[in-house]
Amino acid sequence: MQLLNSFLGFAASIAVLASSADAAPTLYKRKSKSNTNTAKSVAILDGVGVNNTFGVISYREKFPMDYHIWHTAPSTGKTYLQPWNDAVEPSTYYIDEGTFLRTGLKFAYIGDNMDLAFTNHTDWKASKHDDGTHRVDLSQRKPANNFMATQRCGKLDPFGYQLKRSKKVFQACGTQVFVGSGRSIDCQWMDSVALNLSRYYGNTEALSSLPLPRNLSADIPAKSSRLFPHGIYNFNFSAPNKRMQRFTASEATTVNGQNQSVYLTYDVPYGRSLYYYTSCALEFRFTNEFFPMDVTPNDGSAQFVVYNMSGNPKKQTTSSKGPTRLYEVARFNCTTRGCEYTQNIPCPRAGHSHTYELAPASPNTSISWIQSYSPRIGVTLQVYSNANFD
């Protein structure tokens, strides 16, 4: 084995993690090839395994909680659900042969407040001093083991693997990640999904620096509220009796005769206007900033359409019994490099949940992505009311 001689870092173009004596994975920023059509989404659904690089995204199914990617701060080692202090980039992790959770050279440990943090100061055992006593160096930390990611997340439409420690899930207290129970009532249990990135970050060539295709034609005011979907369903119309689950990795496809759309449900709050908003828009932002997204065909001709729906799907709804299309509200093109659009739409009624369907506009077309809060990836809904800010 080789000694790890560089730390893990994410930059805008390229990040390198050198090989390690502990069989740490080798990481590079992936390359985006315009002449290939490999389904990048498949790689992140593979098992996590030992020493395989993965990213972590957390959500809560029973209570609406947006998809949050884990960020570990380089200075403190503490772990957050969004950028915080110097934790500005999403982090990657791996589980070694001893079931220790690691990021680069650093091991996970459990802090004094049961917070999940990482450190490379792990010479925690008692050592003999000049006076003959054995004392523990309190500046050192005992690495925590018993981390595992072996159980698929989701039963009906599984994606990724559940990350747990000692068979228990993690807690979110504000934006910080904790281990164990007995914390404040403001904390909540959450599901954490490990998505394999070993193949995705196995390339040495940087992402293209070309700008994303975009059309910022919407006129949404600056004080708009941005809403993230609280339900993401893959509806397979080729299997009309297959039940769908509420949270999954998104994929809309008509490739090889498939017929699958993505339903996105938003909880639209009341404003001071009570029942209406005056300006609304859908924002589409698909990039390869962290988790991979994929588009077929990749020559820029892939077009997708969004429909307003007659109602909202429920957990375990089948496509044969789900809501129906009312009318088209948006249309956009995308490539494997990504795309970014904002389009005005008719406003949904305030104080209710509302669903939109994203579907390929033609045969042999597909798009797959992982919805996340930060970096903002996927489809968000902007709502604005004149009465909200009187």
Curated annotation (Swiss-Prot):
The entry's keywords: Ubl conjugation pathway
The keyword Lipid biosynthesis is assigned to this record: no
One Pfam family matching this protein: But2
InterPro entries: Ubiquitin3-bd_protein_But2_C (IPR018620)
Assembly description: Interacts with but1 and uba3.
Family the entry assigns: Belongs to the but2 family.
Name of the protein described by the UniProt record: Uba3-binding protein but2
